[in-house]
From Swiss-Prot:
Example GO molecular function: structural constituent of ribosome
Keyword hit for rRNA-binding: yes
Family as reported in the entry's similarity comment: Belongs to the universal ribosomal protein uS11 family.
Stated role: Located on the platform of the 30S subunit, it bridges several disparate RNA helices of the 16S rRNA. Forms part of the Shine-Dalgarno cleft in the 70S ribosome.
Subunit-structure text: Part of the 30S ribosomal subunit. Interacts with proteins S7 and S18. Binds to IF-3.
UniProt KW keywords: Ribonucleoprotein, Ribosomal protein, RNA-binding, rRNA-binding
Transmembrane intervals: none
Classification via InterPro entries: Ribosomal_uS11, Ribosomal_uS11_bac-type, Ribosomal_uS11_CS, Ribosomal_uS11_sf
Protein name, per record: Small ribosomal subunit protein uS11
Organism for this UniProt entry: Hyphomonas neptunium (strain ATCC 15444)
GO annotation, cellular component aspect: ribonucleoprotein complex; ribosome
Length: 129
């Protein structure tokens, strides 16, 4: 019996004009996820996906490239205006935001949703280099 040919699922074009950009910037990586108002993912990218490995993933340039890639994918779905939610202490926060504006998306609001503990978990010990 012949095997059935595997079908390549083609992503359908969603017509979404406004969305939310979640920029998660940690000390090691920067992830950019673009969702609609309900939280369904339209596109995403990260520094690691853009072929940055190791300590280069945490640079502002890697965050800029990841934001440009996610914005380019989202614009194919008709995205024009976004609200930005930045989370985390990483170095790629501002450069990712600038890259989104340079990619042609209109930023309507910027929120910092970094979680701040009210004396929760013990932080990692200080590095001695």
């Amino acid at each position: 019996m012949a095997r059935e040919a595997t079908r390549i699922r083609r992503r359908e074009r969603k017509n979404i004009t406004s969305g939310i950009v979640h920029v998660n910037s940690s000390f090691n990586n920067t992830m950019v996820t673009i969702t609609d108002a309900q939280g369904n993912t339209i596109s995403w990218s990260s520094s690691g996906v853009m072929n940055f490995k190791g300590s280069r993933k945490s640079t502002p340039y890697a965050a800029q490239m990841a934001a440009e890639d996610a914005a380019k994918k989202a614009k194919e779905h008709g995205l024009q205006t976004v609200e930005v939610r930045v989370r985390g202490p990483g170095s790629g926060r501002e450069s990712a935001l600038r890259a989104l504006q340079a990619a042609g998306l209109t930023v309507t609001a910027i929120n910092d949703t970094t979680p701040i503990p009210h004396n929760g978990c013990r932080p990692p010990k200080r590095r001695r280099v």
